């Protein structure tokens, strides 16, 4: 079950390059870290075991032992995991690079077999070609890969993934790329590779090869924000940042194919890159559509719509004594932008509701309350216009000059007053609002900090290391630089 891990252990002494590339955490004496109860394939050692979250991308793809190396498939250091990684589209040339990598690092020849025979300690099964002694020689060349789908990007990590497991909680899926290469040609490569093995080992090798090389591909899974670890999030000044660790090298390659070309023809460059690499920490902002959706869902869950019926003059998030409006603990870990949006939305709705509906106290039970929660939950979905229209109708609009309008005369604070003027592009606020104006104000408050349409879909920790370095040099890793302020603010 751990053929790839065993091969890395035994082949690490074959060459100087192998000594550098085949050191994986699963073969070390380190104590494993705690498990996250997620069972799957570690993409570094390929064994089926319990996984934990990677320091480099915050996804669960590394085992409790390999996590000690702090390696990620998004590093730019040419370690073994990086060498097995390719980004879509997958071509025959890229697949040939994987085959050449296996042949280079895990060769099978009479000399290699004799070397392993001499290395095996004298035991009963020494000359019986038992699998337990020679498992490292049973590593066939297959084109199976674990695939991470980051919306438009697909990243393939090739490896020998044995066994079967449910993939419910895994951020990746296993696919077979043999049809993109040549099935008969790959068969021939493996037949030649196993020809030197004893008969008993040949049958096991062939069984391993055909069992995995003919596996059907799984349907790819889109990576969502819920797949990422929250353990490496820090909260400074009520702004969330993510700590990311990446392995860096000063050497660069134009493409992964060029990297593999140097692996074959310029090993000294690879060794120099490995020996001069360093582990660097990045503090990236966590502003993305996935997190905004999660925060808004939580905001709607904790929302106390009774506030719009109340006479409170304090912001909605600062009500602590009223049992109908108290959200004391809801914003303890909430992003400050969510709190600002919540305060302005409920203050505006309070002013509209108190101006049009005869309601006296926040203890009142009103039919509009579920619509307030719906407005928050639908604030960044296509249903927002329908929800706003229902909310407008709940304000008892009256028809004036063939238009439905609502009154607006209840008190609001000066910051909200200024913001609404900016949204409507007017010098003074009217005492009535049409549906279009009501709609524009709510959307303007929701979008006051960021344009949801232009947010990244996933956190920055899914980007390649080179891009993180570039963003850091430009000073754009911090959230302040990534906030897409609404155009209306620039027009003020």
Curated annotation (Swiss-Prot):
Region: Interaction with host IRF3; residue ranges are: 318-492
> Which Gene Ontology CC terms are recorded?
host cell cytoplasm; host cytoskeleton
Give the span(s) annotated as Zinc-binding domain: 42-79
Superkingdom, taxonomy of origin: Viruses
Write out the annotated subcellular location.
Answer: Host cytoplasm, Host cytoskeleton
Q: Which InterPro entries match?
A: Rotavirus_NSP1
According to the record, the residues making up region (Important for cytoskeleton localization) are 82-176
Classification via Pfam families: Rota_NS53
Locate the motif pLxIS motif: 483-486
Which processes are annotated in GO (biological process)? Answer: symbiont-mediated suppression of host cytoplasmic pattern recognition receptor signaling pathway via inhibition of IRF3 activity; symbiont-mediated suppression of host cytoplasmic pattern recognition receptor signaling pathway via inhibition of IRF7 activity
State the residue spans of region: RNA-binding: 1-81
Q: Which GO terms describe its molecular function?
A: metal ion binding; RNA binding
- Outline the subunit composition: Interacts (via C-terminus) with host IRF3; this interaction leads to IRF3 degradation. Interacts with host IRF7; this interaction leads to IRF7 degradation. Interacts with host CUL1 and CUL3.
The job of this chain, per UniProt, is described as: Plays a role in the inhibition of host innate immunity by inducing the degradation of key host factors required to activate interferon production such as IRF3, IRF5 or IRF7. Associates with components of cullin RING ligases (CRLs) including CUL1 or CUL3, which are essential multisubunit ubiquitination complexes, to modulate their activities.
- Protein name listed in UniProt: Non-structural protein 1
User: Organism, per UniProt?
Assistant: Rotavirus A (isolate RVA/Monkey/United States/TUCH/2003/G3P[24]) (RV-A)
